Amino acid sequence: IFPVISIIQIFMGVGLLLGVFLDPVGLMQPFFKGEISADLIFFSQGIIDVTAMHMIGVGLFIFSLWRLKFDNESNKKIFLAYSVFAGTVLLVALFNHLFRGGGPPIPILILIVSATALGLYGSRKAID
């Protein structure tokens, strides 16, 4: 479970970085009406790159915890802590989809749900 969650987190972060720097207008167009100015792109890149690096950092953190080979009870606590983190991210994503007319694209939402479910599964089964 550790490497799968790690890969999901890193994949989402790298995808966000690629999207915001290779095609910022294409990434932002669904959320803005009218022309997207260079100032708006610059402002958004400054926020999105921090968010993306946070995702990558969490992925690397989870990967390093996997490599430390904790006992199953410790793994259970790690997965529970990750589930709380991922659940918070999921709540924000769902709120944005339902009430704000935005949120992550559906494939990313599926990855967030998958990572949260894997964390919950790991917290119950206490496996690595």
Q: Model features per residue range: what roles?
A:
Residues F2-I8, T51, I78-A86, I108-L111:
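Hydrophobic alpha-helical transmembrane segments of polytopic
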Residues L90-I108, S123-A126:
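Membrane-helix boundary connector in multi-pass membrane proteins
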Residues I8-M53:
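Hydrophobic transmembrane helix segments
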Residues F11-G15, F85-L94:
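Aromatic-anchored segments of alpha-helical transmembrane domains
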